[in-house]
Amino acid sequence: MDIDAASVADDAGRVSLADLLVGLAMFAVVGAAAFTLLDEGRRAWAFGMARAETQQSARVALARLSAELRVAGRGGRGFDAVAVAAPDMLVLQQDLDGDGLIAANGERVTWRLVGTVLRRDAGGGLQPIVNGVRSFRVTYFDAAGAPTAAPGAVRSVEIALATRPDYSVVGSTVETALTTRVRLRNR
C-alpha cells in the first residue's frame, strides 16, 4: 500500500472540528446521564443501609432489654426487681445463685445512655451495646397501669429508643424510633 497514493473512493472521509465537537458533546451528555444514575443508585443504597442499621440496632437493644426485664426479680421476694426507677437509666435485680443477696456478677444489671452509646453493666463495667442512640427514655408503671417512680411498685416498663446511623447520609436524616412495654414476670 502506497501512503502517497491518491485516496480511493471507499476511504474514510475527513473529520472536521465541528464533527469532533458534536461527538464530544454527545459523549458528555451520555456520560453525565450515566454518572447521575450511578450517583442516585449509590445514594439509595446508602439510605437503605442506614435505615437497616438503625432498625437493627434498635431491635437488638430492645430485644435484650425486654428479655432482661421479663426475668427481673427472679430468685426471691426480699428485693425490688427494679432497683432504680429513673427516666434515663434502668437498674434491674435478680438473685441468680439463690443466696438471698444481690451481690454476684449479673445479679444487678444497669442500662444507661452515655453520649450516643447505650451501655450495659452487669458487674464488669459499662459495656457498649448499641451505637448511634439519640434518645433512651424509660417509663415505669404500677399494677394499675399508672406511672410510678417507686421501684417497689413497678410492674411494667415502657422503653422508648431512637437510633441514628454512625455516619451521615447526604441529603436525608435517617432515624428509627421504637417503643415497647414489658411486664415483669416475677412481680
Q: Which residues fall in each region the model found?
A:
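Type IV pilin-like appendage domain
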Residues: A83-A146
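Short, glycine/small-hydrophobic-rich surface segments
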Residues: A46-F47, A52-E53, A67-L96
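A generic secondary-structure signal marking the coil-to-beta-strand transition
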Residues: A34, D88, R155-V157
